[in-house]
């Protein structure tokens, strides 16, 4: 089978798998968060935390719970990283220095997993398991909870309440993420992903030398790393390392784990609001942009200009030969269209066009399909903006699912779409304005700008992948990127919860002849246009100076 046939087979199998599970998983997610019964284990957790599981809260209480829990998580993980040298299973590794510990703690609690360190040489097994892997579960559950709270706000009929964060967090972790991650870890083990507790072992090589190989609890971390759209690797090479991703089967499974919850959440949304066509409209926008991104990235990497790529048949620099350009492009699209950030190839080595597309995925806000929870609430915020714009165009009162889009609602939505660009572009400008911080770039010109832009786009959008041409382990970048992660994660969450509270305080208006149908193909098309215009064109000047300029320069040469 040729490369084209193998690539199409992978994409087709992925599509079939996602189509097969998105309905049952989406319905399961809806039942999980709509139910009123608590499991015995859950009731025990609520008693320990002294939480009234039956209390319904307003959005300020919900937001304070999110921020309080995340702050405690950051402090706990920071202490864990600083004190590693005194902990068991540390493999003799010392604690992290303060700015790197801050960056790592915020990164994993913020579902970003930006790594300015090499995991195999910096962290021991206990920190990997009880520190980073635990946050892989909890950060994903926080995003899931916020998305569900927004949907509750749309469904509520004047109650002003959006649920209980502690109940949503517990259910998302115990009922959704833990079972799915366990199943994913078992399947990854069957494909050859490593799971043990060995340290560094030295083996003789066929060439007569020696090589030191590190084992560890990799499969258990790998499953939730992908399922929770986290992305932080056990090894510095991430999913390009054969212990994390040994073959084509494991690669396809990891891409499936990345996409399965984000693409199932629109179905859960449709079930919760009582109209599956609403979920299909959101899903169609996600799927259309994802498919276009995959096609463009694959084309760019398989039709690269220049004598060397043409002689090799594709741009294979920075890619594993066991995957090739098709599987690498599929993984790169999935990991940047969500908030995952895991990599099985070097994005910095992609063609200018291919690197530009994966960067575009980041700056579009990762809503196609986006991260666990964050993708859905990002799409719903953009749907609110779409309704508002459509209402202005045709002279109708803007309403979404029977909820009026007034000044308060559109203010929350507008601030939501402004936060990430402000953080991203400000951070990039500050880093480029000083010669000392510019010296961390390994490239100059348009590619150097792309590397810097990618770093802050990855941080502000909670992705975590990188163009490796930036030497980011410095006090400035550890601090600045950590701040970008915090602002890019939690400010949008607070605005989403404020929007949910505004909707929850309203009674649902009856649908009339003047109501804009938000489940029609026409609205879905306009929704798609708003995603592209609002999210992508905001960054066009920066993209024009970076990957677009590099691509045009390469075409001329």
Swiss-Prot record:
It is a multi-pass membrane protein. The keyword Membrane applies. The keyword Cytoplasm does not apply. Its main location: membrane. The chain crosses the membrane at residues 4-24, 61-81, 131-151, 174-194, 253-273, 280-300, 375-395, 412-432, 483-503, 528-548. It is found in: Cell membrane. One of its GO terms (cellular component) is plasma membrane. Pfam families: KdpA. Keywords: Cell membrane, Ion transport, Membrane, Potassium, Potassium transport, Transmembrane, Transmembrane helix, Transport. InterPro entries: KdpA (IPR004623). GO terms for molecular function: P-type potassium transmembrane transporter activity; potassium ion binding. The system is composed of three essential subunits: KdpA, KdpB and KdpC. Part of the high-affinity ATP-driven potassium transport (or Kdp) system, which catalyzes the hydrolysis of ATP coupled with the electrogenic transport of potassium into the cytoplasm. This subunit binds the extracellular potassium ions and delivers the ions to the membrane domain of KdpB through an intramembrane tunnel. HAMAP family: KdpA. Belongs to the KdpA family. This is Potassium-transporting ATPase potassium-binding subunit. The lineage of its organism: Bacteria, Bacillati, Actinomycetota, Actinomycetes, Kineosporiales. The gene is kdpA.
């Amino acid at each position: 089978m040729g490369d084209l046939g193998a690539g199409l087979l992978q994409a087709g199998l992925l599509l079939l798998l996602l189509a097969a599970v998105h309905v049952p998983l989406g319905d399961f997610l809806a039942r999980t968060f709509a139910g009123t019964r608590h499991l015995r284990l859950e009731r025990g957790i609520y008693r320990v935390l002294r939480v009234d599981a039956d209390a319904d809260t307003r959005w300020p209480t919900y937001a304070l719970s999110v921020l309080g829990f995340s702050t405690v998580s950051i402090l706990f993980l920071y202490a864990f990283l600083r004190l590693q040298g005194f902990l068991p299973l540390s493999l003799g590794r010392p604690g992290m220095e303060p700015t790197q510990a801050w960056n790592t703690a915020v990164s994993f609690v913020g579902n970003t997993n930006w790594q300015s360190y090499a995991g195999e040489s910096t962290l021991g097994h206990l920190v990997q398991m009880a520190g980073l892997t635990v946050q892989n579960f909890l950060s994903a559950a926080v995003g899931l909870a916020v998305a569900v709270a927004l949907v509750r706000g749309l469904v509520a009929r004047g109650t002003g309440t959006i649920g209980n964060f502690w109940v949503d967090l517990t259910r998302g972790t115990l009922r959704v993420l833990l079972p799915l991650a366990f199943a994913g870890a078992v399947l990854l083990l069957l494909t050859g992903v490593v799971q043990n507790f060995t340290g560094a072992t030295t083996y003789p090589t066929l060439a007569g030398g020696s090589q030191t190989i590190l084992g560890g609890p990799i499969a258990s971390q790998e499953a939730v790393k992908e399922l929770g759209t986290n992305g932080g690797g056990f090894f510095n090479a991430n999913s390009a390392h054969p212990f994390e991703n040994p073959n084509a089967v494991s690669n396809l499974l990891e891409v499936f784990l990345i996409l399965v919850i984000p693409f199932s959440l629109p179905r859960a949304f449709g079930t919760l609001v009582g109209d599956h066509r609403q979920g299909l409209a959101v899903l169609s926008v996600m799927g259309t942009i994802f498919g276009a991104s995959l096609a463009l990235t694959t084309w760019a990497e398989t039709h690269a200009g220049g004598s060397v790529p043409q002689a090799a048949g594709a741009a294979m620099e920075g890619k594993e030969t066991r995957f090739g350009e098709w599987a690498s492009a599929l993984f790169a699209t999935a990991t940047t269209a969500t908030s995952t950030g895991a990599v099985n190839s070097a994005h910095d080595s992609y063609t200018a066009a291919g690197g530009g597309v994966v960067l575009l995925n980041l700056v579009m806000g990762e809503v196609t399909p986006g991260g666990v929870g964050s993708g859905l609430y990002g799409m719903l915020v953009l749907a609110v903006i779409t309704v508002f714009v459509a209402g202005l165009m045709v002279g109708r009162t803007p309403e979404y699912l029977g909820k009026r889009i007034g000044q308060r609602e559109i203010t929350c939505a507008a601030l939501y779409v402004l936060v990430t660009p402000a953080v991203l572009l400000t951070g990039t400008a500050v880093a480029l304005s000083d010669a000392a911080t510019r010296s961390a770039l390994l490239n100059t010109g348009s590619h150097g700008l792309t590397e810097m832009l990618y770093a802050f786009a990855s941080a502000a959008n909670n992705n975590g992948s990188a163009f490796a041409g930036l030497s980011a382990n410095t006090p400035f970048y550890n601090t600045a990127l950590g701040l970008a992660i915090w602002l890019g994660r939690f400010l949008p969450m607070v605005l989403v919860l404020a929007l949910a509270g505004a909707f929850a305080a309203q009674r649902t208006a009856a649908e009339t002849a003047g109501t804009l149908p938000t489940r029609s193909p026409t609205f879905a098309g306009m929704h798609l246009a708003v995603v592209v215009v609002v999210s992508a064109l905001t960054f066009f000047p920066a993209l024009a100076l970076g990957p677009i300029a590099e691509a045009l320069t390469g075409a001329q040469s």
